[in-house]
Each structure stands twice: as C-alpha cells, then as structure tokens.
Amino acid sequence: VTITTYAELQSSIADFLNRDDLTAEIKTFIALGEAELRRDVRHWRQEKRSTAEIDTQYSAVPADFLEVIRFYVTSNNTRPLELISQYELLDRKARNLNAGGFPAYYAITAGEIEVFPVPDGTYTAELYYYADIPSLSDSATSNWVLQYHPDAYLYSALKHSAPFLVEDQRLTVWAALYQAGIDRINEDSARVKVGGSGLRMKLRSY
C-alpha cells in the first residue's frame, strides 16, 4: 500500500479499521496522532535556523518553534548562551540588580526567549531549533514525516481509535509498530548527525 497524501492516509486507516461507522472520526485520529508525533519525534529534517537582532529582555520565537537546539549571540565573536531555568534566571537577576550587559543566559518564559543580562545594546543572535511538524489537511496534503515515514503516521492514527475498539487485540500491535517507527525515525536522525554508523577501520602499522 502506498501512502503519500492525506487522502491516501485516510483511505489506509479506513482499510485497517474496517469499520464504516468510524469514517467520520478518521481525521480526528490523524490529528491526535500528529500531536503524539510532535512529542516523540526529534529529527534533523525539523531543524531550522533563525537570525534576529536582540536588544530587549524578551524576544519572540518563530511561529513554528517547538524546542531550542542552540542559541548563540554572534556579535563580537560567536558565543553560546546557556539555557537555565526560569527560577535560576530570576535569581541571577535579583543578585545582580537586573544589570544590563552582554547576554549570557536564557530561559523560555511564557513562550518567549528571555535573556540575562538584559542587552546593553543591539546584538545579532542565531537560534537553532526544532520546528513543528506541519499538520496535514485537505489543502496541505503531505509533509516530510508522511513522505519518509508513512508507517509512523498510519500507526499513530490507528492507536487513537482505541476508545472505539474495546478489547481489540490489534491495538497492542499498532502501539508496538508505532513505537518501532518512532525509534527508527530518531535513530535515523542520530545516525546522520554523527556521520554514519560510527564504525572505523583500524589499520595495523608495521
């Protein structure tokens, strides 16, 4: 079975369920599966870079922001900012009387990036982050997860049919297949980022 579009995904889910009374629920199953994929998947295809000028304590994150990978100030030599908790950032502000300076720390506060010290000028910053997985719809018919890992999409949706399939033995199988798919996605990303299998040939010298 080939699954490359939103419509084909819905059709495959319907075939697996084999329940005419659940056809209207399939889009909901897909949406719930997408929410789970967002929590479980961290892949290099999600990685993005955003550059901005920071001159205030708070900066907005990109619209598709999911999670920080790295955050740097690139003005006057590139320097990474250290991620700390909101509590620790507040404590540092209190101990330093909220003094301004070159930003060295950041926290995610109310959906924004909060830096400390508060910038004493305008600095260029680069944010490397994981972007959200785009939702499928009748107009947005595919995304990178469906293109490269359709099995994960399929089983994530099938899992969420559970309330309608009481004591159906297939649910355990679908859950296991979903987890196996997630493991493969994340392992694929890790393998690419470390440069292959990690195996190296040892040459003997004479």
Per-region residue spans from a language model:
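Glycine-enriched, solvent-exposed interface loops adjoining structured elements
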Residues: 1-206
